[in-house]
């Protein structure tokens, strides 16, 4: 809505600590430490992994919590299932979507959540 605000930051101290953090971020190469092909987690690790992520938002005098959990390794097993279900949802459930650039949540919303819960081993909760 009109009053929606989003902010993401990494808070650091001033002076040398802040300068060091800024220099670190500006020189990072996020793909530089990526594993080479075949160096990722084992099949057993991918299939037996899981995750539970908690999001918290302060709104007026209350805190709203939402969580997402998955039944496989988030980097391999769950991601591939999310991409696949997003593609199927886009083709089957969102045929009338007007043109433009959307995030999966904005374009498919509840339809995608239902698919992910039904077919991809994900669980979404809001407290």
Locate the predicted segments by residue.
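C-terminal catalytic/substrate-binding lobe primarily of soluble NAD(P)-dependent oxidoreductases
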Residues: 1-127
């Amino acid at each position: 809505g009109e009053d929606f605000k989003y902010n993401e930051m990494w808070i650091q101290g001033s002076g040398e600590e802040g300068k060091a953090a800024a220099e670190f971020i500006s020189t990072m190469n996020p793909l530089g430490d990526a594993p080479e092909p075949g160096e990722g987690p084992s099949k057993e690790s991918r299939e037996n992994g899981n995750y539970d992520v908690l999001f918290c938002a302060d709104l007026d005098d209350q805190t709203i919590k939402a969580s997402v959990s998955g039944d496989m390794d988030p980097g391999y097993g769950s991601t591939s299932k999310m991409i696949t279900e997003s593609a199927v949802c886009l083709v089957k459930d969102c045929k009338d979507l007007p043109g433009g650039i959307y995030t999966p949540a904005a374009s498919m919303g509840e339809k995608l959540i239902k698919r992910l819960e039904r077919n991809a081993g994900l669980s979404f909760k809001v407290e």
